[in-house]
Amino acid sequence: MMIYGLIACLIFVTSSIASPLYIPVIPPISEDKSFNSVEVLVSLFRDDQKDYTVTSQFNNYTIDTKDWTIGVLSTPDGLDIPLTNITYWSRFTIGRALFKSESEDIFQKKMSILGVSIECKKSSTLLTFLTVRKMTRVFNKFPDMAYYRGDCLKAVYVTMTYKNTKTGETDYTYLSNGGLPAYYRNGVDG
Protein backbone atom coordinates (compact mmCIF):
# COMPACT_ATOMS: atom_id res chain seq x y z
CA MET A 1 0.00 0.00 0.00
CA MET A 2 2.86 2.34 0.82
CA ILE A 3 4.41 1.72 -2.62
CA TYR A 4 1.14 2.64 -4.39
CA GLY A 5 1.03 5.92 -2.43
CA LEU A 6 4.66 6.65 -3.31
CA ILE A 7 4.03 5.93 -7.01
CA ALA A 8 0.92 8.13 -7.05
CA CYS A 9 2.86 10.93 -5.38
CA LEU A 10 5.72 10.54 -7.88
CA ILE A 11 3.31 10.66 -10.85
CA PHE A 12 1.66 13.80 -9.43
CA VAL A 13 4.98 15.57 -8.88
CA THR A 14 6.39 14.72 -12.31
CA SER A 15 3.17 15.66 -14.09
CA SER A 16 3.03 19.03 -12.32
CA ILE A 17 6.68 19.72 -13.17
CA ALA A 18 6.17 18.80 -16.80
CA SER A 19 3.10 21.00 -17.22
CA PRO A 20 3.74 24.71 -17.61
CA LEU A 21 2.64 26.94 -14.78
CA TYR A 22 -0.27 29.23 -15.47
CA ILE A 23 0.92 32.81 -15.24
CA PRO A 24 -1.78 35.35 -16.04
CA VAL A 25 -0.83 38.02 -18.54
CA ILE A 26 -2.27 41.43 -17.82
CA PRO A 27 -3.11 43.22 -21.07
CA PRO A 28 -2.01 46.84 -21.55
CA ILE A 29 -4.38 49.40 -20.09
CA SER A 30 -6.24 51.65 -22.52
CA GLU A 31 -5.39 55.37 -22.52
CA ASP A 32 -8.80 56.42 -21.19
CA LYS A 33 -8.32 54.15 -18.14
CA SER A 34 -4.71 55.19 -17.50
CA PHE A 35 -3.19 58.25 -15.88
CA ASN A 36 -0.50 60.71 -16.99
CA SER A 37 -0.16 62.79 -13.83
CA VAL A 38 1.07 61.60 -10.43
CA GLU A 39 1.29 63.55 -7.18
CA VAL A 40 2.37 62.24 -3.77
CA LEU A 41 1.94 64.68 -0.87
CA VAL A 42 3.33 63.72 2.54
CA SER A 43 2.39 65.92 5.52
CA LEU A 44 4.30 65.64 8.78
CA PHE A 45 3.12 67.12 12.10
CA ARG A 46 5.63 68.64 14.45
CA ASP A 47 8.29 69.21 11.89
CA ASP A 48 10.38 72.28 11.12
CA GLN A 49 13.27 71.01 9.00
CA LYS A 50 15.01 73.59 6.84
CA ASP A 51 17.76 71.63 5.08
CA TYR A 52 17.07 68.58 2.95
CA THR A 53 18.53 66.61 0.07
CA VAL A 54 16.68 64.93 -2.78
CA THR A 55 17.81 61.69 -4.41
CA SER A 56 16.19 59.90 -7.33
CA GLN A 57 17.39 56.64 -8.78
CA PHE A 58 15.65 53.72 -10.56
CA ASN A 59 12.04 54.73 -9.72
CA ASN A 60 13.04 55.40 -6.09
CA TYR A 61 12.80 58.96 -4.80
CA THR A 62 13.88 60.22 -1.35
CA ILE A 63 13.92 63.41 0.69
CA ASP A 64 16.47 63.24 3.48
CA THR A 65 16.81 65.53 6.53
CA LYS A 66 18.73 65.29 9.79
CA ASP A 67 15.72 63.74 11.59
CA TRP A 68 13.90 61.62 9.00
CA THR A 69 13.82 60.21 5.47
CA ILE A 70 10.82 60.00 3.14
CA GLY A 71 11.01 57.49 0.32
CA VAL A 72 8.63 56.98 -2.59
CA LEU A 73 9.23 53.82 -4.57
CA SER A 74 7.56 51.94 -7.35
CA THR A 75 7.70 48.37 -8.58
CA PRO A 76 10.88 47.59 -10.58
CA ASP A 77 9.16 47.89 -13.95
CA GLY A 78 6.56 50.20 -12.46
CA LEU A 79 6.01 53.87 -13.01
CA ASP A 80 6.42 55.05 -16.60
CA ILE A 81 6.08 58.69 -15.51
CA PRO A 82 9.19 59.72 -13.54
CA LEU A 83 8.58 61.95 -10.52
CA THR A 84 10.63 64.97 -11.60
CA ASN A 85 9.31 67.73 -9.34
CA ILE A 86 10.37 66.90 -5.77
CA THR A 87 10.26 69.57 -3.06
CA TYR A 88 9.84 70.07 0.69
CA TRP A 89 8.63 73.01 2.76
CA SER A 90 7.73 73.61 6.40
CA ARG A 91 5.29 76.10 7.86
CA PHE A 92 3.73 76.33 11.33
CA THR A 93 5.27 73.03 12.55
CA ILE A 94 3.79 71.12 9.62
CA GLY A 95 6.22 69.85 7.02
CA ARG A 96 5.14 68.88 3.52
CA ALA A 97 6.97 66.85 0.93
CA LEU A 98 5.70 66.82 -2.65
CA PHE A 99 6.67 64.30 -5.32
CA LYS A 100 5.02 65.22 -8.62
CA SER A 101 5.12 64.66 -12.35
CA GLU A 102 2.89 65.19 -15.35
CA SER A 103 3.31 64.23 -18.97
CA GLU A 104 1.27 65.11 -22.04
CA ASP A 105 2.15 61.97 -23.98
CA ILE A 106 3.28 59.31 -21.47
CA PHE A 107 0.41 57.34 -19.95
CA GLN A 108 0.78 54.58 -17.37
CA LYS A 109 -0.10 51.51 -19.45
CA LYS A 110 0.82 48.73 -17.00
CA MET A 111 -0.18 47.86 -13.46
CA SER A 112 1.98 49.60 -10.89
CA ILE A 113 2.11 50.32 -7.19
CA LEU A 114 3.53 53.22 -5.23
CA GLY A 115 4.83 52.79 -1.73
CA VAL A 116 5.79 55.54 0.71
CA SER A 117 8.11 55.08 3.67
CA ILE A 118 8.67 57.65 6.41
CA GLU A 119 11.55 56.65 8.66
CA CYS A 120 12.97 58.49 11.65
CA LYS A 121 16.77 58.59 11.91
CA LYS A 122 16.70 57.87 15.65
CA SER A 123 16.69 54.09 16.06
CA SER A 124 13.27 52.67 16.91
CA THR A 125 11.34 49.43 16.66
CA LEU A 126 7.97 51.15 16.21
CA LEU A 127 6.48 50.36 12.80
CA THR A 128 3.05 51.59 11.71
CA PHE A 129 1.38 50.80 8.41
CA LEU A 130 -0.71 53.84 7.60
CA THR A 131 -4.45 53.26 7.45
CA VAL A 132 -6.37 54.01 4.27
CA ARG A 133 -8.89 56.71 5.24
CA LYS A 134 -10.36 57.39 1.78
CA MET A 135 -9.76 55.88 -1.62
CA THR A 136 -11.25 56.01 -5.09
CA ARG A 137 -10.81 53.34 -7.77
CA VAL A 138 -10.87 54.97 -11.21
CA PHE A 139 -7.68 53.65 -12.83
CA ASN A 140 -6.35 50.10 -13.14
CA LYS A 141 -3.51 49.96 -10.60
CA PHE A 142 -2.54 48.09 -7.48
CA PRO A 143 -3.54 49.61 -4.11
CA ASP A 144 -1.11 52.14 -2.65
CA MET A 145 0.59 51.63 0.69
CA ALA A 146 2.65 53.59 3.21
CA TYR A 147 4.41 52.97 6.50
CA TYR A 148 6.00 55.05 9.27
CA ARG A 149 8.93 53.78 11.35
CA GLY A 150 9.89 55.59 14.54
CA ASP A 151 8.44 58.16 16.90
CA CYS A 152 9.94 61.49 15.81
CA LEU A 153 6.59 62.73 14.40
CA LYS A 154 3.12 62.92 15.96
CA ALA A 155 1.03 62.57 12.80
CA VAL A 156 1.77 61.49 9.24
CA TYR A 157 -0.57 61.95 6.28
CA VAL A 158 -0.02 60.71 2.74
CA THR A 159 -2.18 61.63 -0.25
CA MET A 160 -1.52 59.98 -3.61
CA THR A 161 -3.35 61.54 -6.55
CA TYR A 162 -3.46 60.18 -10.10
CA LYS A 163 -5.03 62.08 -12.97
CA ASN A 164 -5.75 61.67 -16.65
CA THR A 165 -5.35 65.24 -17.94
CA LYS A 166 -7.22 64.48 -21.17
CA THR A 167 -10.39 63.06 -19.60
CA GLY A 168 -10.20 64.85 -16.24
CA GLU A 169 -10.62 61.59 -14.30
CA THR A 170 -8.93 61.66 -10.88
CA ASP A 171 -8.07 58.83 -8.52
CA TYR A 172 -6.67 59.30 -5.02
CA THR A 173 -5.67 57.45 -1.87
CA TYR A 174 -5.52 59.15 1.53
CA LEU A 175 -3.62 57.39 4.34
CA SER A 176 -2.71 58.44 7.88
CA ASN A 177 -1.40 57.09 11.17
CA GLY A 178 -4.24 58.37 13.32
CA GLY A 179 -4.55 62.11 13.21
CA LEU A 180 -3.75 65.30 15.00
CA PRO A 181 -3.44 65.44 18.78
CA ALA A 182 -6.66 66.35 20.62
CA TYR A 183 -5.34 69.86 21.30
CA TYR A 184 -5.47 70.65 17.58
CA ARG A 185 -8.62 68.62 16.82
CA ASN A 186 -10.66 70.45 19.47
CA GLY A 187 -9.22 73.89 18.82
CA VAL A 188 -6.95 76.01 20.96
CA ASP A 189 -9.60 76.69 23.63
CA GLY A 190 -10.66 73.03 23.85
Curated annotation (Swiss-Prot):
Q: Which UniProt keywords apply?
A: Early protein
Q: Does the keyword Ubl conjugation apply?
A: no
Q: Which Pfam families match?
A: CrmD_SECRET
Superkingdom of the source species: Viruses
Instruction: Please indicate if the UniProt record lists Cytoplasm as a keyword.
Output: no
Instruction: State the family named in the UniProt similarity comment for this chain.
Output: Belongs to the orthopoxvirus OPG209 protein family.
Q: What is this protein called?
A: Protein OPG209
- The scientific name of the source species is Vaccinia virus (strain Western Reserve)
Source gene? OPG209
